[in-house]
Amino acid sequence: NILGWDSVINLTELRDKCESYGITPVFITPTPLNPELIRKVKFIESPPYDWKEQRAYICDWMKQQKNCIDISEALSDSNGNLKAELATDGLHPDAEGKKIIGQAVEDWLNNYLTGGNTGE
């Protein structure tokens, strides 16, 4: 398991490299997990006990960047887990979850391309 801090270091390097080549990086927050559903799938390793804290660390960093698409709320239940109806295995969003993510990306792009979100 990769710690949130390590992920942020890697994402920072990726962001900086993109910007050095004139590429505008756009971050999308990682999807939440549903440990209860993951445990039912025998071939997927259970997430670490502190997965929410590690994910929150990454999400907090992403939300501070110029361009971030936050999908957290749309995919999370009241406990901060991936909504059960959006992922059979508790890890990978199914069609409806992907539709929600796709719509968030489309909305962000439309806003960005029409000047509503300049990333500043």
Where are the regions a protein language model picked out?
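Solvent-exposed loop/turn segments at secondary-structure junctions
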Residues: 1-2, 31-35, 73-77, 91
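Short, flexible, mixed-charge acidic loops at enzyme active sites
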Residues: 76-84
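Substrate-gating cap/lid alpha-helix
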Residues: 11, 21, 32-73
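A short helix->loop->beta-strand "cap" motif at the edges of active sites that frequently abuts
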Residues: 19-25
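The substrate-binding groove and active-site-proximal loops of carbohydrate-active enzymes
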Residues: 1-6, 44-50, 89-92
